[in-house]
């Protein structure tokens, strides 16, 4: 995931936005945790679920979140193990990818602007990608602001059951 982190940091640093994106040299959670002290937002792009970098650092990361730092988790980093990790993801982000509940098939959504400042200047768009859906969210989406939403086609429900591919719950929903 390092290459993806480097590409994202480069794009952010060249965007003209008032940000300084830094990619840490450590693989996994930083050995010197003080490097996170000055971060306004922490972006995590890593293997998820049982291999997630935060599984063994929930207490330390929770302390950062309680200081008001932002968090962005990309792709598999949204996957949490049931129990403490899942509970913390709900607290920090309002939702997560829950294996055998959520699915991530390739499909082409049509995203339309919503009334939110992040949509300023963005036109409707669609991209054929692996879009997660049927995510596990906090009750009543309290504190969650949906930004990209669409209803996946029925064809995404035809895959066999698996951790990320299909399950009776998603087909019933």
Residue positions per predicted region:
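Short, charged/polar low-complexity linear motifs in solvent-exposed/disordered segments
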Residues: 19, 90-91, 165
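A glycine-rich, often tryptophan-bearing local segment used as a flexible ligand/cofactor-contacting loop or short
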Residues: 51-124
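Short secondary-structure boundary micro-motifs
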Residues: 47, 92-93, 130, 163
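Short, functional N-terminal and low-complexity linear motifs
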Residues: 28-30, 85, 173
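Catalytic beta-strand/loop cores that center a nucleophilic Ser/Cys/Thr
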Residues: 13, 98-173
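Helical hinge/lid and interdomain linker segments adjacent to catalytic or ligand-binding clefts
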Residues: 2-80
């Amino acid at each position: 995931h390092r290459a993806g982190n480097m590409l994202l940091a480069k794009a952010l640093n060249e965007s003209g936005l008032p940000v300084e994106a830094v990619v840490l040299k450590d693989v996994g959670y930083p050995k010197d945790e003080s490097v996170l002290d000055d971060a306004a937002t922490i972006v995590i792009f890593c293997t998820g679920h049982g291999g997630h970098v935060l599984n063994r650092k929930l207490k330390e990361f929770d302390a950062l979140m309680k200081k008001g730092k932002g968090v962005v988790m990309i792709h598999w980093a949204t996957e949490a193990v049931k129990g403490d990790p899942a509970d913390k993801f709900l607290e920090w982000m309002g939702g997560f990818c829950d294996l055998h509940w959520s699915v991530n098939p390739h499909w082409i959504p049509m995203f339309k602007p919503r009334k939110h400042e992040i949509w300023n200047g963005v036109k409707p768009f669609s991209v054929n990608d692996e879009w997660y859906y049927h995510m596990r969210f906090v009750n009543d989406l309290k504190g969650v602001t949906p930004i990209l939403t669409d209803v996946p086609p029925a064809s995404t429900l035809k895959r066999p059951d698996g951790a990320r591919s299909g399950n009776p719950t998603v087909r019933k929903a």
